Amino acid sequence: MIIQAVNISVFDNKNTNIKIAIIGDYMGKFLSEIKQNLSSNSLVWIKPIEDETDLWYAVEECKITSGQMEYVNPASFSVGRAYLDPENNVPCVIYNNENKRVGFISFRKIVLNKKGFNWSFYIDKNYQNKDLGRATAESAIKTLKNVDSNMPIFLTTEQNNELAQRLYINLGFRKADFLDGDDLVFIHE
């Protein structure tokens, strides 16, 4: 059984840090499928958040550069989403080949208008530029295709995030002819 206990940082319009506690437990089918099909490579391995140490790392210690903050939601958002919809969300920590925590990824099953998978991830600023982002994306693709090879993967990115766009195209995604709000959508089938 996975135990979630997290303090989510929320900032109001006066930039006051407000802590919200979420405590719950779950063991959903999607989590079970992800755990059975997790893929690793020579640079990274991915593990669902199963203890407070990983949870604390994901929501408090794992940091990105200030220039990247506009591109990703904080881990606390994904952990909160998993609490509200545990059947379709699996937050995880990314480890490098030296067993050090180096990032955060959250797998998501899309069940609304289009069926498919999605993920959101980032590498800690202290471990960037070491090919860990690409290695994580490759492992994520393999993991999700092992869960269901017929399910497409939909990723979104800001229109000015050219680095993510190049990565997605190099990994076999194609740019969709529709947007998600203002964001570009990439599809891996």
Task: Show which residues each predicted segment covers.
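Acyl-donor-binding surface of acyltransferase catalytic domains
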Residues: 4-14, 19-40
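Acetyl-CoA-dependent GNAT
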Residues: 30, 39-120, 124-126, 143, ...
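Active-site acidic-Proline motif in GNAT/NAT acetyltransferases
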Residues: 124-130, 159-160
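Conserved acetyl-CoA-binding loop-helix of GNAT-fold acetyltransferases
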Residues: 129-142, 166, 170
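Conserved GNAT acetyl-CoA-binding A-motif
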Residues: 146-156
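Conserved beta-strand-loop-alpha-helix junction that forms the acyl-donor binding cleft
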Residues: 154-165, 181-183
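Conserved acetyl-CoA-binding loop of GNAT-fold acetyltransferases
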Residues: 169-178
